[in-house]
Amino acid sequence: MTVKGLETHTPMMQQFLRIKAENPDTLLFYRMGDFYELFFDDAKRASQLLDITLTKRGSSNGQPIPMAGLPYHAVEGYLAKLVQQGVSVAICEQIGDPATSKGPVDRQVVRIVTPGTVSDEALLSERRDNLVAAIYQNSKGFGYATLDITSGRFMLSEPETEEAMQAELQRTSPAELLYPEDFTQMHIIEAIKGTRRRPVWEFDLDTARQQLTMQFGTRDLIGFGVEKTERGLSAAGCLLQYVKDTQRTALPHIRAITLDSKDHSVILDAATRRNLELTQNLSGGFDNTLASVLDHTATPMGSRLLKRWLHQPIRDTKQLNHRLDAIAAFKDTGMFIEVAEVLHHMGDLERILARLALRSARPRDLARMRSALQSLPQLADLLADIEQPRIGELAKYSAPMDELCELLERAIIENPPVIIRDGGVLAPGYNAELDEWRDLADGAKKFLDDLETREREQHGIDSLKVGFNQVHGFFIQISRGQSHLAPDHYVRRQTLKNAERYIIPELKEHEDKVLSSKSKALGLEKKLWEELFDQLLPHLERLQNAASALSELDVLANLAERADTLNYCRPELTDQTGIEIAAGRHPVVEQVLSEPFIANPTSLHHDRRMLIITGPNMGGKSTYMRQTALIALMAHVGSFVPAEAVKIGSLDRIFTRIGASDDLASGRSTFMVEMTETANILHNATSKSLVLMDEIGRGTSTYDGLSLAWASAEWLAEKISAMTLFATHYFELTELPSMMDGLANVHLDAVEHGDEIAFMHAVQEGAASKSYGLAVASLAGVPKAVIKRAKAKLTQLETTGHQQAIKNPSKAPREEQQLTLLPEPSDVEEALAKVNPDEMTPRQALDELYRLKALM
């Protein structure tokens, strides 16, 4: 619907269409009394998305106007549903007074709720960051900026390749993504729900610099270290303007922008984040992830920080040791228990402060802030007993703020209502004038009780009652049977079926006074509420620093608790390349097993750069590889790790090529996905990388797969010298350690008992003797007849060779042997190899010929 032809509509509908034209890409919630109404296509769309009734109102061009509505008091629930579906909503409120308005009451859009810019508690997942992001691209690479409006955290980066950009998108998982209308790499963002197409000019670099310096109150951006990041700044400028447009208010909590440099991080590509299941499992849930084991934080803001740490391990050994020292101090003193108990009272201070900055904080937000401030002295006392530099530094930032605490204690009642609209939030004694107006309003009940008693007794009307409603105000009600007793000065106001209602001058005078006092008390309370924000906002930076310190204290105390409870050890960080793990365990798998986890060692160093891992399917190869990567990652987060001892050098990247499935959306087969991930590793791994390669070459023919696996292993070992765990079912690869330096064979052990198999899950030196494939198939429930036939076919393949067995599928001996890719020599071939015809007599030669004939 356009704004053309407005004259054919009612004044109210004309107003709606004008406002809708200014907000074409959002659902417009148009306030009408106690409801938000939607019209035209918005109504149709909302009825489908929210499962609400679609009705009609008036007409347009002879056609009824579609309409849908929802009660204003239930709007949060509906907004939550829309935001989860990536839909933005413009909230249009009545700002004029209906009593004084000529025509439609004035309305305007007061805020735009979008998936990435919501700050309302009811619309957010408390333990996950909610980011709005912008992406930009030119010939040199990508620019990427993210903003968490609920904390003010503003970051930018400049990924150079498509793979790096995809990794950033997966790491940050934005709820909303802005992109320029000329963006060409749409396939990398199509999976994101809340994408927003923006004009190219919104990414203008000069405009971006101007926007950012204005926001931060600086002359330039040199102090933030982002002056030369032109691609990133283009994205950041568009992002900041979008947030300003949607919030319609100042953003004082966004005080800086930070360059997210990959030089200081252990880089994890998209496949690695997915395969290691850091915060999301392969099914898209949270269960059985690393975060599900490690996250026992006391506050939502601590939980979010821990997840950021897991997704961005760091290389700075000094910073890592600061974290490890703090965890050790909490663990050794046992203070993590008491600290966690105090932190539980802190709530989500970080997001409360964001709502304060946006002036959208609710009464219970400030009550929770008061509770947090009241807990700071107790926390300070606990931290004072721990002599550790990092904890001491954090304690300074989270020091008590007595003056702010006292202000909130004076201002807010103990249990305030949800919203300020109806008053009753500010405490008695906070403001003398407010107390006076409240006393006038509160005195109404006694006056009415006295009036009712007096009138009833004076006129002998026992059915007389004094009441009030919103339409008629105060009234005296007399039953129909006694209405003839009403005095002459009673003025009839309303007639009901069984009663009459009257007004008298004294009651009217009191009504005016009461309504006036209530109105003035409410108006004054709302004014004082806004002034309370003005008193708190100058302390915003200090409060944000405290929230940041409390978040880190929460994570460190939590990791100390996890280390103590789960028997983790402190990793030793060195400058030498290598990974030495004694009795390592998988942090997630050991928590879900009913029996004890079998711990295993890992040793990778200059003279042992690659482990060729063989063993039966289900024997634990993938678990062993993943646990090594997770232990390495946890060490680079600054956490204790599940092992008896760990010594690890600095890593630059962790790669995983584990498992694969079809990427139907991109038209890529399983094998194509596998080869793409392999190519990424071979191009980008270095001697400081940890590489996990699991079953390369499964998705193609046997010999193609073996060739690719062999060549990939050679390249990783010789050209890159990366620390590599290379699991394979190609036993031919176990020859590599005898042909090249720096490689070793290990295997996962298993024991067969007749037709049954027992997995030992223990890593042993040397190659596996067999694959146990048929035993695993039997364990999986494959029909016995199929297993029997497979054994026969296996024997034929071993005996006659691959091609001959295919040509004669029915001639299958029944002896059980182990399959290898390149068949071992047959008995005849081995016998012939030992024969020396020059040393044989004719009789011996004839006998040997008969013997060989018998072997066939």
Curated annotation (Swiss-Prot):
Q: Which GO terms describe its cellular component?
A: cytosol
- Tell me which residues bind ATP: 615-622
- Spell out where the chain crosses the membrane: none
Write down the Gene3D superfamilies for this protein, in alphabetical order: 1.10.1420.10, 6.10.140.430, DNA repair protein MutS, domain I (3.40.1170.10), MutS, connector domain (3.30.420.110), P-loop containing nucleotide triphosphate hydrolases (3.40.50.300)
Chain segments carrying region Disordered: 798-817
- Superkingdom: Bacteria
Presence of the UniProt keyword Metal-binding in the record: no
**Polar residues: bias regions:** 798-807
The UniProt entry's GO biological process terms, in alphabetical order, are: mismatch repair
Keywords of this protein's UniProt record, alphabetized? ATP-binding, DNA damage, DNA repair, DNA-binding, Nucleotide-binding
Q: Which GO terms describe its molecular function?
A: ATP binding; ATP-dependent DNA damage sensor activity; damaged DNA binding; mismatched DNA binding
Please name one Pfam family that this protein belongs to.
Answer: MutS_IV
- Family label: Belongs to the DNA mismatch repair MutS family.
What this protein is reported to do is described as: This protein is involved in the repair of mismatches in DNA. It is possible that it carries out the mismatch recognition step. This protein has a weak ATPase activity.
Q: Which HAMAP family match?
A: MutS
- Under what name is this protein listed? DNA mismatch repair protein MutS
The UniProt gene name for this protein comes to mutS
